[in-house]
């Protein structure tokens, strides 16, 4: 499924995908400063609220299994529109939830809808190719970093003016805007073919039988898990353990987001100078170094905002350097299965991030040590995967 687009069409598509990226930060990032308010309103602990975010990611990962194959068979546009509408319905339900169980239920509905956002990878694959494709992925990662950097501050303002419901209000409004924009911009693409269960999952069998495909997505997933685990744990570390105010937390995360943007800029520069494999290795080395730095600083000076942020700035630079290239290499292996490839990769990314953050959350009073140890372990696994991939040539 390939659509040739003129430059203005490409520019409009990039803007739409950037807006979708902005929309995607609300369920996981903008809501972070509202952890204390949510725990108070629903009479639960901040750790359980963090646990709910991890469950959101795991549920999203499972549901992504269906999105890709359906998009390859029935078209991206209809599924994207249905997903955006469903995510808005889930967010609306969260506003009217009477207890924590209902909040979780409607968060699952929101997660089902948000699964459609993974189609952005396939939409990029449909329009761009080669070095331009890799460059667009880097831009998307950088754009995501900008939104992530601003999201805690935005969440703090929304919490101040609208309460914990604020992020859901804005999510609903943005969903409506993206839905209307998608109706106008995206071309119709559909199929009347109704697949059998065997046909439906045959694409996954083909993809997961390719060690290079699985390896590149696992590298991206392991790097993402480092970032995601910190995001989920950050309210617990800064607001609960270090007693930072919501605004202090927001400014600390703004600095973290700035590092995310810097990593994207650095990735773009490195992309012009060095091969993709070297860029992946560079990013993984930075993640490993961040784990060592965090262990060293916290052992020498104790846990503080500074001893946590310095290694996290290194880690996020590594994440943004290696992930776009790993994603592009994985997606380029099976271009005729772009939607299924997106779902398979997103499954690994969100499942890994959700499960690893759940494990780290169990550390309770030793969150920084658990984070640092996970950075070392995950980067080591990624190094082994990268070495195995380079030993095996791709067979089309």
What are these model-derived regions, one by one?
Residues 327-365, 375:
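A late C-terminal transmembrane helix in Major Facilitator Superfamily
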Residues 62-100:
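Conserved MFS/SLC helix-loop-helix module at the cytosolic interface between two early adjacent transmembrane helices
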Residues 43, 75, 96-102, 129, ...:
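Helix-breaking motifs and short loop linkers at transmembrane-helix boundaries and internal kinks
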Residues 100, 106-144:
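Cytoplasmic helix-loop-helix junction between adjacent transmembrane helices
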């Amino acid at each position: 499924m390939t659509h040739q687009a003129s430059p203005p069409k490409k520019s409009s598509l990039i803007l739409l995908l950037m807006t979708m990226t902005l929309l995607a930060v609300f369920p996981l990032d903008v809501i972070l400063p509202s952890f204390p308010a949510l725990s108070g309103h629903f009479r639960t602990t901040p750790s359980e609220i963090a646990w709910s975010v991890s469950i959101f990611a795991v549920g999203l990962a499972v549901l992504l299994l269906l999105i890709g194959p359906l998009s390859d068979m029935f078209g991206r546009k209809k599924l994207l529109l249905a997903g955006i509408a469903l995510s808005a319905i889930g967010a609306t339900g969260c506003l009217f939830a009477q207890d924590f169980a209902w909040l979780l239920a409607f968060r699952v509905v929101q997660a089902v809808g948000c699964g459609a956002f993974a189609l952005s990878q396939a939409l990029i694959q449909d329009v761009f190719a080669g070095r331009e494709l890799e460059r667009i992925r880097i831009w998307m990662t950088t754009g995501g970093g900008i939104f992530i950097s601003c999201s805690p501050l935005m969440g703090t303002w929304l919490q101040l003016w609208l309460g914990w419901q604020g992020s859901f209000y804005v999510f609903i409004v943005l969903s409506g805007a993206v839905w209307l924009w998608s109706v106008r911009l995206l071309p119709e693409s559909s199929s009347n073919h109704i697949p059998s269960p065997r046909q439906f999952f045959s694409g996954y069998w083909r993809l997961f039988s390719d060690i290079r495909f699985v390896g590149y997505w696992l590298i991206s997933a392991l790097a993402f898990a480092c970032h995601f685990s910190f995001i989920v744990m950050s309210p617990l570390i800064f607001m609960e353990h270090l007693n930072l105010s919501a605004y202090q937390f927001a400014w600390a995360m703004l600095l973290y987001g700035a590092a995310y943007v810097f990593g994207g800029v650095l990735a773009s520069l490195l992309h012009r100078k060095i091969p993709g494999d070297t860029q992946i290795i560079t990013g993984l080395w930075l993640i490993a170094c961040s784990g060592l730095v965090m262990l060293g600083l916290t052992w020498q000076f104790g846990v503080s905002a500074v001893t946590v942020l310095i290694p996290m700035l290194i880690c996020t630079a590594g994440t943004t350097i290696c992930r776009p290239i790993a994603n592009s290499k994985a997606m380029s292996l099976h271009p005729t299965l772009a939607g299924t490839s997106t779902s398979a990769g997103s499954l690994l990314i969100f499942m890994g991030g959700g499960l690893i953050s759940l494990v780290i959350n169990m550390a309770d009073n030793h969150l920084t040590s658990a984070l640092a140890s996970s950075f070392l372990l995950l980067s080591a696994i990624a190094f082994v995967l990268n070495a195995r991939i380079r030993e095996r040539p791709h067979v089309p």
